[in-house]
C-alpha cells in the first residue's frame, strides 16, 4: 500500500499532463498530491518517512520554481535531485559506518559486511545513473518523451535493477517456515 501512495503523485502528474498537455497544470497537481500524501501519512500514522519529507521539499521548491518562473526545467530536475540525494545518502551512511541498506533491510536479509557494501555501491551507482539519464532525456528529447520516461522508463529500469539485485541476493534470503 505504501508503494502505491508514494507512486500516486507521479501517476496524478502523468494523468494531469496527458489530459491537459500542460506541464504547469501537471506540476500543480503533483505539488498538491504530494502535500496530501504527506498529510495523510501524518494523519494516519503520526509519522512521515524521511523520503516523503524530501520528496515534498523537492516538489514544493522545484515545482514552485517551475510555476513561479514558468520554466518547466525546474520540475524536470526533481527526479535527478531525488535520485542523487538517495545515492549520496547511501554513500554517506556507508562512510559513517552505518550501512543504510542494512538498517532498512537487515531484519529480512542476513549478509556479510562486504556484500552489504557491494549492494550499497550498486544502488548508489544506479541512482547516479538514473539521475544522469533523467537529465539526458529531459534535455535531448521532447517534453512528451520525458513525461513518459519519468513514469515508464524510470519504473522499468528500477524494476530490472531490483530483479538483478534479487538474483544477486537470493542466496542470502532465508525462507520463512
UniProtKB/Swiss-Prot annotation:
Q: Note whether Nucleotide-binding occurs among the keywords.
A: no
Q: What's an example GO cellular component term for this entry?
A: plasma membrane
Task: Tell me where on the tree of life, at the top rank, the source sits.
Answer: Bacteria
Query: Its membrane topology, per UniProt?
Result: Multi-pass membrane protein
Chief subcellular location equals: membrane
Give yes or no: UniProt keyword Cell inner membrane: yes
Q: Which InterPro entries does the record cross-reference, listed alphabetically?
A: YciB
Q: Which residues cross the membrane?
A: 23-43, 50-70, 73-93, 119-139, 149-169
Can you say where in the cell this protein is located? Answer: Cell inner membrane
What is this protein for, i.e. what is its function? Plays a role in cell envelope biogenesis, maintenance of cell envelope integrity and membrane homeostasis.
Task: Fetch the PANTHER family from UniProt.
Answer: INNER MEMBRANE-SPANNING PROTEIN YCIB, INTRACELLULAR SEPTATION PROTEIN A-RELATED
Q: What is the protein name given in its UniProt record?
A: Inner membrane-spanning protein YciB
This protein's species is: Chromobacterium violaceum (strain ATCC 12472 / DSM 30191 / JCM 1249 / CCUG 213 / NBRC 12614 / NCIMB 9131 / NCTC 9757 / MK)
Q: Which gene encodes it?
A: yciB
